[in-house]
Amino acid sequence: AEDSVLFIRTWGAHWLIGTTDTPWDQGLDHPAASASDIEYLLRNVNRVLNVELGVEDIDGVYAGLRPLIKGKKGATSDLSREHAVENTVPGFTTIAGGKYTTYRVMAEDAVNAAIADLQGRGLIGTVPKSNTENIPLIGAIGLAEAQNQLQANAKNFGVRPQEVDHLLKRYGSMVGELMSILKYRPELVTPIAGQGAGGAGYLRVEALYAVTHEGALHIDDIVTRRTHLSIETSDQGLEAAEEVAQIMGAELGWDGQRIKRELTHYQDRVAAERDAHTAVDDSGAMLARNRVPDIRLTRV
């Protein structure tokens, strides 16, 4: 909507620009940005830039949906981003709305509501107050120590200074787990292919770590989820996918045919997303994107 908030934020070597904040009445599995969405953002961002941006300057595009609590009337940009919790029926607590950045208070409110429901029906006694606001994020405990150790030992692993910063930002104190892998797989210290000189600097060891520690099972899981290679590279991660497939295949026991199927699926996905970005409206974008269902829904 024209009255939506425009964000321009640095994102590593890129800018992150959004949002459109428009209603969506298509499927929920893979919301896709249309040419109209892209044109809208370019038109508005160029109002405040000295040098105009064009489609050719875009490396990646992605779309997502906000679970807004619907009002009786008004534009989506006017609707609240807050969440609401209700005990809709005995034993069933519902949470609606909200956003990623408030996930902890959302969870606390939902659990508190469920506890209140159970206590009100005499099913449980006193429950300690939630401590979630005091619990550090994963990788936060021991961060300073991990930073000192990595900086002191980086040369021993072949990790360059800029990669030290990259790994610490992504993994925090968990970075030691990646260093443990590099002890016996030193060849994985090199960057994943296709990132270019100004790329984010994802290392090959991160692809293996995504499989061994983060549950990655398909190329999509790494190129679009565990990393942002799909939106941070000019080819949407196609070159990176080739290398990721080899690393994953060696760890997961894929044969040549399985690697080929995984790569073909990712290549088809990128082609579908590119077509979606040239569609004039939401329905056309969804029609293009839905040509390639999620790989978990297909036989591999």
Please give the residue ranges for each predicted region.
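C-terminal accessory subdomains/tails of enzymes that are appended
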Residues: 1, 10-14, 20-300
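Dinucleotide-binding Rossmann-like beta1-alpha1 core, especially the glycine-rich loop
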Residues: 6
